[in-house]
Amino acid sequence: MRIAILQNNSDDGPAYLGTWLTRHGVDFDVFNFDADDAPPATLASYAGLALLGGPMSVNDDLPSLRQSESLIREARDAGKPVIGHCLGGQLIASALGAKVSVADSPEIGWTKIKLSEGSEAHDWFGEFSGHERDALQWHYDAFSLPEGATLVAGNDVCPVQAFAVHNMLAMQFHIEIDRNKLAAWARNGKEELAALIGQPHVQQARSIAAEIPKRMAASHTLADRIYEQFIRLART
């Protein structure tokens, strides 16, 4: 069994997703569009598809984004699981006909998200469904719900934080982060964040980094449960 991972930016690699897959003996291939990798022509040899984040908008005129959407629809038609992190989640929404647009407010840094109750949420979140969890955000856009999708996570800043549909989970938040990835983001994003001082839902780099010790473990615990379901679906 192999998983295809689509990477949109060289600074936004698989991180904890790759660590988790390796730990559980799951093979995967990473297609880094930022390094001019071509996407897989088909998902025929893959059991599932994972999409990572990136600084671009789903609405940008980039061939890699349209190719990603095509692969998402192929996975849907084949009943294969798909998981999307931030831009990856927005690509799922767009591929399924939902609107992706600039959010009312950027959301950057550590936040709380409320995981829904119900069977779809429980499938992905298990015992965490119905509770608040820590999550790392870094997004300017937001998605609406595609037809037939179920809202499974939200908060006051971004009411649609995640949805489930067709063996797919689309998330605005970043469960794939690890310490190294987030520390690099905080370090490299200082100027970006400084330009957003005064925005009510944007943490500055120092605050993001300072909260890693107390927040990362909870993020990984949620990621563990989500990735377990992703691979469970890939094996069926």
Q: For each of these PLM feature ranges, what is it?
A:
Residues 96-181:
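Pocket-forming structural segment of enzyme catalytic cores
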Residues 1-80, 197-236:
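N-terminal beta1-alpha1 cap of cysteine-dependent amidohydrolase-like domains
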Residues 74-99:
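Catalytic nucleophile loop
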